Amino acid sequence: EPLSPSQKAAIRWQGREGVTDCRSFFNYSRLTADDRVVWGSSEAAYYRGNGVGPQFDHAPAVYTALEASFARFFPALEGVRFPFRWGGPIAATTRFTPFFGALHSGRLLYGLGYTGHGVGTTRVAGRLLAHLALERRSELAELALVRKPPFPYPPEPLRRWSIEAVTRSLRKVDGGAAPGFLLRVLDRLGIGFSS
């Protein structure tokens, strides 16, 4: 619902700047033209076998977590309701960065894994894919996002177990803990946020 002038004053959000935090499972926010708060997160539910479809587009547990994080971030906005919700699948690589490449002797170009700040990434992705399509040598075409494919996810059931274990470990880091053994090993293998 739109914020009242007093609610906006209470949180000191005078402009319409986009806001994000720096956690592994980050939240982001902005004000719409009619002063509604768009509140989102990199939280995503994993469904066995990479399940996608309308039945997976809404995850009540994710919405509950979003409302709780909103209340912690904006305690002065207690009671603000969220009449609109949306969700859906995301594409994440094991490095949590996009990857670009070509198939069929360069006749098919692709970009995938736009996790997190994907909308902002599309501007650079368009330029990068144009350089690949034109076979133009450039700094963009030489990035690791093109040269170094992400490590593949393991097959089920190892995939689900590994995603759950990494998620638990990242939540501990978000809570202030140092990266544990699992995250350190994955980083050394070139898998994860720091790889």
What residues fall within each predicted segment?
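Short beta->alpha junction loops/turns
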Residues: 89, 114-115
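Active-site substrate-recognition segment that forms the wall
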Residues: 1-5, 10-104, 185-195
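General beta-strand recognition
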Residues: 38, 109-110
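C-terminal lid/capping helical subdomain adjacent to the catalytic/cofactor pocket in oxidative enzymes
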Residues: 104-109, 115-195
